[in-house]
Amino acid sequence: MTGEKSTIETTIAHYKVSKKVLSESSPVWDASLRGHFRESRSSTVPVYFGTLKSLELWFRIVHNVMVDEMHDLQVVDVYEAIEVCGNREWDISKLSKSSWAREWMNRQKYRELDLNAMSRLIYIAKELDFPREFMYMTQKLVYGTADHIKDRNPTKHQHLHLDHTIIRKLAHYSYSDQFLMYSADALNGAKGNLRCKILKGLFTPVGVFLQQSCECKKDSLFEYCKGLSHTGIWPLESHMKNSAQEILDTFDEFECDKPENACYKCLFRLSDSSIERTGNQVQEHFDGLCLDCMSVSKPKDGKDVDAAYWQHDTLKQYSRGCRVQHDQPTWYWSFMGRRTQMQAQQVARQR
């Protein structure tokens, strides 16, 4: 016994490839196959990275010999393919712009996925540049997640994740008149903002009742609070731990009796339509994140945010030039620049 550890190599697959095609597909392959490495003088090149399917996917893409079974790859293998992309310095656009990518995403049936599955797919949707799918899934995660929103990488390559400006491990919220200030990541900030809007919509009428001069306001306020209790909003501290969507879904339970002496102002605020209006406004508030707004607002090479991003706000055309239609909240939360820049823009906008 020498005390030295021994290793046994086992070949688990063979791929027949063109050395010329591989060399032309990436500088790393070119250096290893045409340079002074041992592989350049051999007809067999050992590969120690990736998975069987992730490597096969790349080899088929660069050789342009796709087969249908590649469109049914597991999410984990696509993560591995993205990792291989960095390892071999393959241009990821070869993957994202391929016909394979579109068909693979179509087969994911992303609209039918649960939130956990969406949290595994959003990173791929961003890396492979699927704006509609990314927007839809980020919207669903913001409305449907009760706890901190995370992207879930199912592989050991945990460096493959969304940028911290999109999802951060920890978020700290501070409320301003119109928005949660940009102290949280985009998705969790948008989620917190929805909850603030729900609270504001539900409890603003309480302050209005108190300011009225009518004699019926006391009885009307009591009935309004009873109506809110039917939705399960109380106890508030436990109910607000639910997702925004779970809270909004309880609005259908709002119902209150009308005091016999109630004036028309009180009757209006006691009507189902007041709660329904709040529910509709919050439900339609956030469209999800926009990849195009994210791209144009992310500073490049130390430069400031592209002027085209701020122009959206100036012109009130928030999805101008974007591949998906959206409103102002999506534009705001898709901002990838420095927080101080957005804060300064919001202050200037309110002058």
Residue ranges and their predicted role:
Residues T2-Y110, F203-D252:
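Canonical BTB/POZ domain core
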Residues S98-A101, M105-R351:
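Acidic, serine/threonine- and proline-rich low-complexity regulatory tracts
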